[in-house]
Amino acid sequence: MEQTYEYAWIIPFIPLPVPMLIGAGLFLFPTATKSFRRMWAFQSVLLLSIVMVFSIYLSIQQINSSSFYQYVWSWIINNDFSLDFGYLIDPLTSIMSILITTVGIMVLIYSDNYMAHDQGYLRFFAYMSFFSTSMLGLVTSSNLIQIYIFWELVGLCSYLLIGFWFTRPVAANACQKAFVTNRVGDFGLLLGILGFYWITGSFEFRDLFEIFNNLIYNNEVDFLFVTLCAVLLFAGAVAKSAQFPLHVWLPDAMEGPTPISALIHAATMVAAGIFLVARLLPLFRVIPYIMYLISVIGIITVLLGATLALAQKDIKRGLAYSTMSQLGYMMLALGMGSYRSALFHLITHAYSKALLFLGSGSIIHSMETIVGYSPAKSQNMGLMGGLRKHVPISKITFLLGTLSLCGIPPLACFWSKDEILNDSWLYSPIFAIIAWATAGLTAFYMFRIYLLTFEGHLNAHFQNYGGKQKTPFYSISLWGKNGVKKNSCLLTMNNNESTYFFAKTKYPIDKNGRKMTRPFMTIAHFEHKAVYSYPYESDNTMLFPIFVLGLFTLFVGSIGIPFNQEGGNLDILSKWLAPSINLLHQKSNNSMDWNEFLKDAVLSVSIAYFGIFIASFLYKPIYSSLKNFELINSFVKKGPKRILWDKIINGIYDWSYNRAYIDAFYTRFLVGGIRGLAEFTHFFDRRVIDGMTNGVGVISFIVGEGIKYIGGGRISSYLFLYLAYVSIFLLVYYLLFSTL
């Protein structure tokens, strides 16, 4: 077994040849490299599959032996300082390696079809393979220096992938926003690393934890400085995992291709922050203020992400805010010390969210044949609806991911989220109330996304593009400004946007694309006729990864269920994490009280079903046909209560649609303040600093010109003036010093 561990250092480097060979091929033999581009995709999948098999084998060995393995190479610079490079294989490493490889393989297979007609196909696969290399290097690092190096490489890859379509100004701005926001956290991470090295004299995790715990036990450290260093370390995780207040880059990151969104939100970039906090938890747990800060940031992010998802019209942005909220649950669990629950939710959420993003990509792909190749249109849920008849496989798998994220048993996220909710009662009742309420919000906004996308009729066929008439045919409201601001019935859609899809603009479909015959029909609507096509199901290359992730969503939660209660009541996950849990808690109780579990499960599932019911009441098409019934009319009647209710709804909508005004606050005060400071600095430099320098020159020029006109050109006059000035100077000097 030890021989197997000795070769674990190769894990990050196995996918690396693909980006290197693609880059060299495009530089030296561009035509030949592009002609064999499918071969590069196959190699990317093959190499990552090798890493996956190796990671699974290491995980099985760890489950059976419950051991760590660390290997270090030392580069001695002098007698007082040396750089150590190595790798650490422990339960956290093996979990993250399996997540990265399994999700990464599914995304690569999916991308082969999704990016088939993109000119940047090879560049995309080069970035993806390098992204996997960077993340695998991060999770296998044995010290903080390696962590920081691969941390920056992960940030670089995310910058390249978010701005993959860099010719679009929106995508270029999004990748810059992500890069700059993460620079704030990365700078804090670097300062924190240097601070703890100054305290302990080591970058290695095992030595760092041992030395620091001894210093704390003997009260030999400055707690204020230690707390500051810990906060700086945590700032890196806050930025990378999109936690409040450095979350603003996450929704804009949706400007990249959809497979990138799946990888970033499931197993790579946003998971890196959770991984860092989990890795450094032995360091943080002896600093109570930091643990409380982690839990506070987590619970704020949980609620904020859920509220911001309520009014999103873009399907990918809605899922992005959902990711933000679920990451908040993980951070809350880590802050409470629930190490196992946090990693369990990291696993279950990764597969569920990858399923949802790839499913949304399939939906977007199908909508592009109708509304054109524009993200603002193909991702707009207001133009969707009724897709269950056209994309049934995507509908079923998307529903699985939605139910899992809502916490409906027996799907994956039910088991992990329920543990976090139960632990929150023991930690803080206030945090528990917020966490449980947010579980209901999660069910509401996730089913809102599902219903707007799949239920009812296809909205793109019934849009009133002229904006002169109301369109009551299809009455699911998107809860947008057009519906809410005018105090119209919540279940009626008004279209006042002057957007033309079929009347004025034609969107040709690539002839080299899918050669599929689709039914066309002519729909007469408000005295105008147009020819419409319907969405279609994606190809098998895209459906296969979605199907596999659906299976993961169904069954991955079983690793945390204690089936065998004899002799310790350990489930697979607890046995897997036993070395890490024992390191954190010497006397860990892994037993499960099934009665308590059932009570809490009934409550959490009831809250989830309540959120689903509210979403169904507001967005399911069956209620749109009840517009004349007394129940619906009671909501529409005007009156003081109705006006107050409209104000509340408008306020919630504005809060959610405007991203809680946090972006506006940063733009006005932070960006505006920096620009104001820059303008003041520019003014001071040009007017004051340069003014003093230029002023001396101007004065010298004026004095010189004045003297030039005084002089008459006679040397005798110059000598007379010179002697006169010297005589006056000597006289003054004599008078001053003779009196002393």
Curated annotation (Swiss-Prot):
GO terms for molecular function: NADH dehydrogenase (ubiquinone) activity; quinone binding. One of its GO terms (biological process) is ATP synthesis coupled electron transport. InterPro entries: NADH_UbQ_OxRdtase_chlpt_su5_C (IPR002128), NADHpl_OxRdtase_5_subgr (IPR018393), ND/Mrp_TM (IPR001750), NU5C-like (IPR003945), Proton_antipo_N (IPR001516). Its EC number is 7.1.1.-. Its main location: plastid. The chain crosses the membrane at residues 9-29, 40-60, 89-109, 125-145, 147-167, 185-205, 219-239, 258-278, 286-306, 327-347, 354-374, 396-416, 425-445, 543-563, 602-622, 717-737. This is NAD(P)H-quinone oxidoreductase subunit 5, chloroplastic. It comes from Nicotiana sylvestris (Wood tobacco). The gene is ndhF.
